[in-house]
């Protein structure tokens, strides 16, 4: 996994990955003075709560201390994982890497602000990654939806990427000489969410839900730059 690199991971909780030297720190008080020179950085943060305050604290308030801590290191690239939430469309529109960013909720605006702050600090050294819904660690949520959903109000387009494909794409960026400033990462197979729930219902021999309306919500997201790069998915659909 290391591919010859020395890897250090930092989080607020213990980790047991054998391939990395792990430090327990709060990124808001980040101290990298005792590390060997760091030349490649991945920023992958997750808020403890999905509120506006949670997004502000996790994504935006952490930028300045991270930037400050990295000033003494020879950073060649910083890869910042954001989200396709920065795209505010919600009527079944097609979105790709050339789409204009127009967040419509405060969480989306805060993610975009985080992106801009890192781009201002690192310019062409910054690569922003916007994954769609990440799956592959647990199907508990979908099983619960399958068991409890008898009807669905509309056709809601959903998009996803397997966690292993996302990790592989992040890792292979090290070998890309001239990366794009940003990449959407998704499996390029938008699916109405009710169809995913129905699939689980069939596997579990449960009654299939009924769709109440043909109104479209959500968005159909395509990773045009990822596809152009030649990256091959190992999990092309979620079924």
Describe every region a protein language model picked out.
Residues 86, 134-136:
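Conserved sequence/active-site signature of Rossmann-fold short-chain dehydrogenase/reductase
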